[in-house]
């Protein structure tokens, strides 16, 4: 599969924490597009387990092997971030029909706020379809083993958070 002319895409999310499901989508997007920017949302309305800086750092660490992937934190509207980095496409993951309904509404809002911004939806590989950051946090908080759901650096950080 060949790439089109220069394409810069944004994969936005809270990534609290980044999971193997996220990484699966990032690796696949990196093969399809020239540049992938992981946009880690500050999300002040959410009570995140990890700070914005930690979440950006995790994203950078787990994607070091991908030359065309970077990670940045942002606050405010995602469309403003996309405009600031001159991105023309958003990557969004869909696990369920509930995700689809939510993303469909967001996509229409994004189009109104930033005409020309397209959304590309990727479904996760079967082994990652059930993974969510929320579930991973819950399992970790209750002492469960999350090593099969998140990259090693994240599993270690979750283990440390549980000790605190």
From Swiss-Prot:
Keyword Nucleotidyltransferase: yes
Record site feature (Transition state stabilizer), residues: 22
Cofactor: Mg(2+)
Binding site for ATP: 14-15, 22, 93-95, 103, 128-134
Subcellular location: Cytoplasm
E.C. number(s) listed in UniProt: 2.7.7.3
Keyword Magnesium applies: yes
GO biological process: one example: coenzyme A biosynthetic process
Molecular function GO terms recorded: ATP binding; pantetheine-phosphate adenylyltransferase activity
UniProt superkingdom: Bacteria
Pfam families: CTP_transf_like
Cited CDD domains: PPAT
Top-level enzyme category: transferase
Positions contributing to substrate binding: 14, 46, 78, 92
Biological function: Reversibly transfers an adenylyl group from ATP to 4'-phosphopantetheine, yielding dephospho-CoA (dPCoA) and pyrophosphate.
Membership in a protein family: Belongs to the bacterial CoaD family.
Subunit structure, as described in the record: Homohexamer.
Protein name as it appears in the record: Phosphopantetheine adenylyltransferase
Record organism: Vibrio vulnificus (strain YJ016)
């Amino acid at each position: 599969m060949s790439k089109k002319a220069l394409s810069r895409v944004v994969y936005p999310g809270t990534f609290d924490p980044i999971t193997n499901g996220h990484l699966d989508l990032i690796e696949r997007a990196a093969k399809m597009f020239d540049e992938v920017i992981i946009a880690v949302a500050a999300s002040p309305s959410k009570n995140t387990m990890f700070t914005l800086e930690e979440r950006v750092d995790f994203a950078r660490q787990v994607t070091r092997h991908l030359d065309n992937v970077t990670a940045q934190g942002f606050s405010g509207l995602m469309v403003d971030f996309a405009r600031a980095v001159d991105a023309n496409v958003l990557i969004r993951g869909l696990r369920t029909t509930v995700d689809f309904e939510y993303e469909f509404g967001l996509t229409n809002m994004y189009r109104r706020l930033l005409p020309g911004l397209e959304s590309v939806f990727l479904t996760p590989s079967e082994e990652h379809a059930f993974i969510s950051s929320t579930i991973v946090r819950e399992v970790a908080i209750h002492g469960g083993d999350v090593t099969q759901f998140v990259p090693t650096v994240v599993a270690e950080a979750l283990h440390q958070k549980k000790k605190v």
